[in-house]
């Protein structure tokens, strides 16, 4: 007999068919807010070599052994040192520049004699929130999220141009149609973070610092030439979360994921300056996941990296020569982040020159260490300092240091201004047009303003994360080594040192920082660096780019 067909419950089947499909989870869009402009007013100080006007003290001042004030910049709130130029951001969002303008890094007309060596305003289509300077380029983030840049990038063959069209002597919109929230400059590359958590890179890629090109393409000799180098392009990491913070050293790029807090790094690693192994290779062409944790800020020079963690401690990694790591008489490469033990106080800000380093304490004390050949350390002599030393000067005595930034042969500092200083700093010019945003948004990381209120509402803004808010008042110790007495003793010496140098004899006194030729060093890392020599020509640094 034929089998009977199984009976089906038509009612149940109908109910199943009528059930609505499961609702899809709404994807929450990742979004970073624009940062706030710094608010603590400061005075600009400089030291080092000024052979191309990077000291901002006029054509006749070619050297400063100690920190000297720069006039004509009112209400300064942020600074950035390039290779041979500087940017200063004011409270109102204007930008002053001074120094070498051979390739347009100043972003303004300097056809008038002596105009490079004195601070002057850059004409921008809006007000700036933050600034960054490289060897020959400059950039800023405006209040509406646009990124403007000017100048040029360079590689081992020389000038690359800022875009495929060449150098740009005035600011141009580099990321049209994209809202950005952070920028960071290396020597010859620029890193940009968008509000969507995406990272874009542009510039020289010879050391892998762009993190997105093949070994054949990094030199610009591929099928597409330099087009892929000079057009901001997204750096994509498979399975990585959106990013919330970026940093750049001379030849490296660092990024932090928003959810995992993982730090990714790409670029030159011949002295382990990425703080991670690259399996025998000199550089990382694409980002590698590091073991760095709890990072507040990262700075670096040619072959070393300075790391500031959220517990306000300073660590270093990389090449030790000339004392740039601050660890004493160390001979071997430091492959893992090592705490600088001489910095016993809480550190709130770090900076680097090519072969030197700086740290600012919660009490506003400035430390410097490394190569002193160009007087970048600001301690009054040209000696190298193997360990951190307190910088003592009549221009910093009794004042609170805020920021430090090192260039190729000079350094720039921001010291908190008092009421009298603010009256004396009268604006030279009125800024151009602006597009001021009505709402200043809080940055996604290092919420400086809120943290500062927990430390000291009057003096410690922008200098401390929330976890350390209860300890600041107890840590205000007087400068070491009787700083007040030292400052009095150096006053007379500074008066002698601060006499204008004669142009006819200045070339004999100009010193050049130790040039770290990475290509040769990789082959012979154990070999000692030659003793730094004095420069014969001011433009010596404009040669081919060294790796």
Curated annotation (Swiss-Prot):
Residues 533-547 have a biased composition (Basic residues). It is found in: Nucleus; Cytoplasm. Keywords: Cell cycle, Cell division, Cytoplasm, Guanine-nucleotide releasing factor, Mitosis, Nucleus, Phosphoprotein, Repeat. GO terms for biological process: cell division; central nervous system development; NLS-bearing protein import into nucleus; regulation of mitotic cell cycle; regulation of mitotic spindle assembly; regulation of neurogenesis; regulation of nucleocytoplasmic transport; ventral cord development. Pfam families: WD40_RLD. GO terms for cellular component: condensed chromosome; cytoplasm; nucleus. The modification Phosphoserine is found at residue 526. Residues 427-436 have a biased composition (Low complexity). Residues 437-464, 482-499 have a biased composition (Basic and acidic residues). The modification Phosphothreonine is found at residues 286, 512, 531. It comes from the Eukaryota. Residues 1-24, 423-547 are annotated as: Disordered. RCC1 repeats lie at residues 41-91, 92-143, 145-195, 197-257, 260-310, 311-362, 363-416. GO terms for molecular function: chromatin binding; guanyl-nucleotide exchange factor activity. Residues 517-527 have a biased composition (Acidic residues). Bj1 repeats lie at residues 417-454, 455-489, 490-519. Promotes the exchange of Ran-bound GDP by GTP. Involved in the regulation of onset of chromosome condensation in the S phase. Binds to chromatin. This is Regulator of chromosome condensation. It comes from Drosophila melanogaster. The lineage of its organism: Eukaryota, Metazoa, Ecdysozoa, Arthropoda, Hexapoda. The gene is Rcc1.
């Amino acid at each position: 007999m034929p089998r009977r067909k199984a009976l089906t419950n038509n009612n149940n089947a109908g109910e199943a068919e009528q059930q609505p499909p499961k609702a899809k989870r709404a994807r929450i869009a990742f979004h970073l807010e624009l940062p706030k402009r710094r608010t603590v007013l400061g005075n600009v100080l400089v030291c080092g070599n000024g052979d191309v006007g990077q000291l901002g003290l006029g054509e006749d001042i070619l050297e400063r052994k100690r920190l000297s004030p720069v006039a004509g910049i009112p209400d300064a709130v942020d600074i950035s040192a390039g290779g041979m130029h500087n940017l200063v951001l004011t409270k109102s969002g204007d930008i002053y520049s001074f120094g070498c303008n051979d390739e347009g890094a100043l972003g303004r007309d300097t056809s008038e004699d002596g105009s490079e060596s004195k601070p002057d305003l850059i004409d921008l289509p809006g007000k700036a929130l933050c600034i960054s300077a490289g060897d020959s380029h400059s950039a800023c983030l405006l209040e509406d999220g646009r990124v403007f840049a000017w100048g040029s990038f360079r590689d081992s063959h020389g000038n690359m141009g800022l875009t495929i069209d060449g150098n740009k002597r005035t600011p141009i919109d580099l990321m049209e149609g994209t809202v950005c929230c952070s920028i960071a400059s290396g020597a010859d590359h620029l890193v940009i973070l968008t509000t969507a958590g995406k990272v874009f890179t542009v510039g020289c890629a010879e050391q892998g610092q762009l993190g997105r090109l093949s070994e054949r393409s990094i030199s610009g000799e591929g099928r597409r030439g330099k087009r892929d180098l000079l057009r901001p392009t997204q750096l994509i990491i498979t399975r990585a979360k959106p990013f919330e913070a970026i940093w750049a050293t001379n030849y490296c790029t660092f990024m932090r994921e928003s959810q995992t807090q993982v730090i990714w790094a790409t670029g030159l690693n011949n002295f382990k300056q990425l703080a991670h192994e690259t399996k025998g290779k000199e550089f990382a062409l694409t980002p590698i996941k590091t073991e760095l944790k709890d990072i507040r800020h990262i700075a670096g020079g040619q072959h070393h990296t300075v790391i500031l963690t959220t517990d306000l401690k300073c660590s270093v990694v990389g090449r030790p020569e000339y004392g740039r790591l601050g660890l004493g008489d160390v001979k071997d490469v430091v492959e893992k982040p090592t705490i600088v033990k001489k910095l016993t106080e809480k550190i709130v800000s770090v900076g680097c020159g090519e072969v030197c380093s700086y740290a600012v304490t919660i009490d506003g004390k400035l430390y410097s260490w490394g190569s002193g050949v160009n007087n970048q350390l600001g301690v009054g002599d040209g000696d190298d300092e193997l360990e951190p030393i307190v910088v003592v000067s009549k221009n910093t005595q009794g004042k609170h240091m805020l920021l430090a930034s090192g260039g190729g042969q000079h350094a720039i500092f921001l010291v908190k201004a008092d009421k009298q200083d603010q009256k004396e700093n009268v604006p030279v010019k009125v800024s151009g047009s602006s597009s001021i945003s009505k709402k200043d948004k809080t940055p996604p990381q290092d919420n400086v303003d809120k943290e500062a209120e927990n430390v000291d509402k009057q003096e410690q803004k922008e200098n401390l994360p929330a976890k350390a808010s209860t300890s600041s008042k107890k840590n205000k110790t007087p400068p070491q080594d009787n700083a007040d007495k030292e400052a009095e003793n150096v006053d007379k010496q500074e008066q002698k040192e601060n006499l204008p140098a004669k142009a006819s004899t200045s070339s004999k006194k100009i010193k050049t920082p130790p040039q770290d030729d990475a290509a040769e060093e990789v082959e012979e890392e154990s070999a000692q660096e030659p003793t730094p020599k004095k420069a014969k020509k001011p433009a010596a640094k404009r040669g081919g780019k060294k790796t």
